[in-house]
Amino acid sequence: MKSYRKELWFNVSKRREYINITPAVEECLLESGIKEGILLCNAMHITASVFINDDERGLHNDFEEWLQGLAPEKPYSRYRHNDTGEDNADAHLKRSIMGREVVVAVTSGKLDFEPWEQIFYGEFDGKRRKRVLVKIIGE
């Protein structure tokens, strides 16, 4: 059994942003040489998420509105976490809702997806350099 690990680094220009990382993850799979196995992809930041969904702008806007309705950024004073001097309690809650990681089957050297599935990095407290871990195990 083989194992492959790589960190993907990128800059996030906005506080909240959804980035399609599927091409970078597929490149990792190609580099790994693994044809059958499991791929794990997780956010390496406590205020970010990795999730699978459709790459459609309207849906991304729906995510943004829905998450802002559940955990609005402001007023900062509404969150106990922000009493510590932070201003990102909403980002922690959004991450809890959207999840930390995805696990995808690898079949015949490809991500075993249906046609519309894509892997996204969801950032909820950005404007700086961020990273994602890709771990692939298989043969």
Indicate residue ranges for each PLM-predicted region.
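Active-site histidine-anchored catalytic micro-motif
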Residues: 1-139
